[in-house]
Amino acid sequence: MERMLLLSPPSLAARPERLNTILSSHSRYATDLQMLDRVAAGLVSLPQSTYDIVMLLTDVDGLGTGSTSAMGRGVIQSVVRALRPGGKFKRENGTFTSTECPDNTELMLAGLVFDDTGGLLKPDFGPENIVPLKLGKRKPVHSVSSNGTGTSGPHVNMQLSTGSMLKGQTTTIKGVGFVDFTDDPSLSEADIYSGQTDDELIDEETLLDGEDMGRPIIQPPECRPKAGKRRRACKDCTCGLAERLREEDKAARAKADATLETMKLAPKELAEVDFTVQGKLGSCGNCALGDAFRCDGCPYIGLPPFKPGEEVRLLSNDVQL
């Protein structure tokens, strides 16, 4: 028994007597009813490959404009999936023609085709057949290269087997010839592709000599640092600028350390001068002015002022100038 699905437009829900009349003309055991607006809204999902016939009911007015406007792309795809292979999609009031249904393009893009009666049919392509592809052995074949000389190369045998249709038939596709670009004809193909040849390998370290490495690097003007600013090296510097800056910093630090070493005095080089000891000289230059201008440790404390350069004798009878 054929399974049938009736798609009802929303306007028929207000006319239950007409809907019952339509349902009475079909077997209730093999007929399902779904509202078109619920299918369009995604509230109802149609089972796949279940129905032999899907019929689109017309509106209350019999024009079918409401049902046609509700047939969107999603509804059409759901209907096609619900049809069995070879199933039909029909309309209650007629056929799908270009004047009555503006969605014929969507119907055909969904996979439906028109039959002789004007209805839409889901094609039955039958079970899927697996076509094995077998590669035959390589055999040398002679071909002509672009310079007119004959070369040999492999060809591929491809056998297509599709059961009774192509049983016993073998199709051979010849490949193009391969041109040998090697200078040594004694080398085999395996040696050529494996790289095991007698060609000398060039050491990359010998490409540049000392003279090349000693040449000055010409720096573009846009890369030169501005006047008064020191150029900074990149974080991942590879041009040698970072090493050169480190050497300059190291040399400047060593020079500063050497300057500090010359200014340091050893403990043996330090001596404390006690001006209270007789025979010592004052260094302030105010000794001749009197006690008011003399230092605390001046050896002339207590003596009257004297003229600069005048000979002065202390208690020890030492001459002080």
UniProtKB/Swiss-Prot annotation:
Gene Ontology MF term list: 2 iron, 2 sulfur cluster binding; 4 iron, 4 sulfur cluster binding; electron transfer activity; metal ion binding
GO biological process, one term: iron-sulfur cluster assembly
Residues annotated to bind [4Fe-4S] cluster: 284, 287, 295, 298
One Pfam family from the record: DRE2_N
Co-factor requirement: [2Fe-2S] cluster; [4Fe-4S] cluster
Motif (Cx2C motif 1) on chain: 284-287
Subcellular localization(s) per the UniProt record: Cytoplasm; Mitochondrion intermembrane space
Keywords per UniProt: 2Fe-2S, 4Fe-4S, Cytoplasm, Iron, Iron-sulfur, Metal-binding, Mitochondrion
Region (Fe-S binding site B): 284-298
One Gene Ontology term, aspect cellular component: mitochondrial intermembrane space
Region span, Linker: 132-213
Binding site for [2Fe-2S] cluster: 223, 234, 237, 239
Motif (Cx2C motif 2): 295-298
Region named N-terminal SAM-like domain: 1-131
Region Fe-S binding site A: start-end pairs: 223-239
Function statement: Component of the cytosolic iron-sulfur (Fe-S) protein assembly (CIA) machinery required for the maturation of extramitochondrial Fe-S proteins. Part of an electron transfer chain functioning in an early step of cytosolic Fe-S biogenesis, facilitating the de novo assembly of a [4Fe-4S] cluster on the scaffold complex CFD1-NBP35. Electrons are transferred to DRE2 from NADPH via the FAD- and FMN-containing protein TAH18.
Free-text note on domains in this protein's UniProt record: The C-terminal domain binds 2 Fe-S clusters but is otherwise mostly in an intrinsically disordered conformation.
Known partners and oligomeric status: Monomer. Interacts with TAH18. Interacts with MIA40.
Family: Belongs to the anamorsin family.
Name of the protein this chain belongs to: Fe-S cluster assembly protein DRE2
Organism of derivation: Coccidioides immitis (strain RS)
